[in-house]
Amino acid sequence: MVQPLRRGVRPLTWTRVLPRQTRQPASSHRRAQARYVQIRATPTDQPATVNGSNVPIVDTPSSAESADARFEVIGAPYSLLSVTLSASQNLYTRRGTLVGLSGKADNVISTLSVLEPFRRAPVGVPFLYQKISSASPVTALISTRSPVTSFAVVHLNGSVDWMVAQRRALLAWTGRSLSIRPTINTSLSVAHWGSSEVTGRGLLALVGSGQLYSVELKEGEKYIVHPSNVVAYTVSSKPPRPYRFKSTSLKLQVPGLKSLPTFLQNTQFIKAMSETDSWKTAMRIFHTVRTWSRMTIWGDRLFLQFDGPSTILLQSRGARMSDVLSTQEVNEFASTPRGLTIVPTKQEEKQKGSEQDGKDDVHKAPGTRSVDEIEQEIKGVTQSIAVLTKEGKVVFQKPGQQ
């Protein structure tokens, strides 16, 4: 019995595992091949350097307070808005964003308000808001349905007006003298299409995609930013202007009849073809393809230039180009040369017009005197005496001559 057991039993082999410190050669070889990458968050209280100028890019304030209300952004990353209202103070918030409310619920009155639908609907600005008022102080929580949004609060003291650039950035506001007017694009300006001008005194709550940051520009400073990342900015005497970067571009030209010679344009065949439905449909398709290519392929060149002093609220995740710019604006920017597209003011136009009129008057003014008259004026006035001779001839003599 013992022999079979001994045959089936094998000695156990073991290996001693040395600590990492004792394996100096292998450890040093592995350490030489390793690459250490250290990632640290950039402090937001330090100004960022842009083209040699210190342009501070900081986080938006988390709270704002007035005499009758207080807005405070809570949560990480900024997912809730806490609103503290005093008695008889009105709060306007977007429909479906109220999460909860603390206080005497019997004193709270909630009504659905329709704010200027005929002015807001054409530009895509929401016009259904919930009006909340209470006879006693209450605290409300407000949120949005999107999981990638953050809040920013703005305190308006009446000295500086704000322009909300994004159509759905306005979430809530309060203030008895606060006025919000939607602006309609009438002059193809990117700064006022689908925007809302905010004036007066009160508190404003804005929402953006991703994280919101504030850019402070001083006098003489300039900043170029993509329009889809601009949430709001202060209204100043220097509105933002469109800017295009230099890059290689493929020009798409829509075939037109004006490019043909003049004798071909006047033919009956060309005139009849331009009036057909097939030609108009083809032109419409060509224009649509050109606009789509400008929005998708060359859309990164369309920017806005802000001049200080100004405050800009930016969102880290930009919206679609079609949500910010209209097709007419895209075609207008793409057709302009690179650089800053400056729109002349009325005063400059009047000054140029008066100068041009003066030049035209100088060129068109008829001469009042001939060359002979001018030469005669330079030489002076001379006097001659006509003398009739015996032969019947008339001879002109100067005075004193015999």
From Swiss-Prot:
Q: Which Gene Ontology biological process is one annotated for this entry?
A: inner mitochondrial membrane organization
The record's region (Disordered) falls at 344-372
Transit peptide, residue positions per record: 1-36
- Would I find Repeat among this entry's keywords? no
What InterPro entries does its record include? AIM24 (IPR002838), AIM24_sf (IPR036983), Trp_RNA-bd_attenuator-like_dom (IPR016031)
Q: Which Pfam families match?
A: AIM24
Q: Where in the cell is it found?
A: Mitochondrion
Provide this UniProt record's keywords sorted from A to Z.
Mitochondrion, Transit peptide
What's any one GO cellular component for it?
A: mitochondrial inner membrane
Disulfide bridge positions per record: none
Give start-end positions of Basic and acidic residues composition bias: 346-372
- Does the keyword Mitochondrion belong to this entry? yes
Source species, domain of life: Eukaryota
Q: Which family does it belong to?
A: Belongs to the AIM24 family.
**The name this protein goes by in its record:** Altered inheritance of mitochondria protein 24, mitochondrial
Per the UniProt record, the source organism is Emericella nidulans (strain FGSC A4 / ATCC 38163 / CBS 112.46 / NRRL 194 / M139) (Aspergillus nidulans)
